[in-house]
Amino acid sequence: MKVAIIGSRNLYVNDLQKFIPSETTEIVSGGAKGIDACAARYAASNNIKLTVFLPEYNRYGRAAPLKRNLKIIEYADLVIAFWDGKSKGTKNVIDNCKKQNIELIIHIKEK
């Protein structure tokens, strides 16, 4: 199962193990700091394939992170969102998952 781990850049989760399904075969990330970095570390330390979608600023300009997020959620089988309750980017992912009926688990974590 391809699991996208997305979230606010100011959040960190040290033990992702309890949030990630055991049938996970691939972690999908946006390559940013915060939750994305936690996801990359988790994948590396657990020998799980990591796929990173980076924003294409040359192609999309300021909209690049939002375009990247759409690619992530379309690619993944499950999206796990860690949200600080404020991040507009994470909220956008949550809203898009709901609109597209993409399987989504939301964890609201304050900084």
Q: Model segments located where?
A:
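Acidic/glycine-enriched connector segments
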Residues: K2, G7-E26, G30-K111
